[in-house]
């Protein structure tokens, strides 16, 4: 009898060991997926194939070099107008375009009485850095611009509005949540969190839901280790809660293929009641129609939405 029991116990132990090894390998694979996929996305300096000069838009810009709290030099371009109603800080996306593409927006806003400062995120263009931080550390870039504005007498008592697109939109929301000196927000196509965006895009590429959702917490774990656990709660869906009574305009397109629409709904679940929204049909990631990117007034619906928001809250 005992002779029969011993082999059973041995096989039970063997099966437990095999199951443990398989579980370990499975978890190891899940841990390796985020860095394997993200490495080529974030461990680089973006050198743009196309950049623009202010003169291309019949503008004059003051070129700035601003240093962040963590020692990164940020390139920025200031388009000033006398007695501005507000100064708008422009922030672009993860890999493109250069923020200099928004000189057309700066020209348009100047015609309406608004100054602009366009800055290249760390690890982009003429800014320093070799790691894209997905909106976690880029709030320090925004803070450097805000500190410059606050140091200039010409901007005394002038409201500050942050305007971001895609990862820049996420950075804009994170920035207004962390920087009290910012008075207003315009965000286009922001993701609710990076791990949400990662999971949503896996689903868009045809990955089974079970895999996409299983990988998501490992993406979060990876970004926490990579960017520091002090950034763990710095996500747009959390930072929007800190808006207080400041005005905000959030925009998204329903069929966005880069930052799927569920990110917008997640952010809005936590948004204060005064937050204004505009949703476009189709896949228009930059919200402005492609043929009007450099001349936003040519997209009347887009232009009216933004100017209407600015005039409503900062026009007097």
Model-inferred region functions:
Residues 14-67, 77:
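An N-terminal hydrophobic leader/cap segment in hydrolases
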Residues 95-108, 121:
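The serine-hydrolase catalytic nucleophile loop
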Residues 108-128:
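Conserved alpha/beta-hydrolase
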Residues 132-153:
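Alpha/beta-hydrolase active-site loop
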Residues 175-229:
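Hydrolase active-site cap/lid region
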Residues 243-244, 249-252, 256:
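Short beta-strand/loop motif that positions the catalytic acidic residue
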Residues 260-269:
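Short alpha-helix in the alpha/beta-hydrolase fold that links the catalytic acid
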Residues 269-316:
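C-terminal catalytic histidine-bearing segment of alpha/beta-hydrolase fold enzymes
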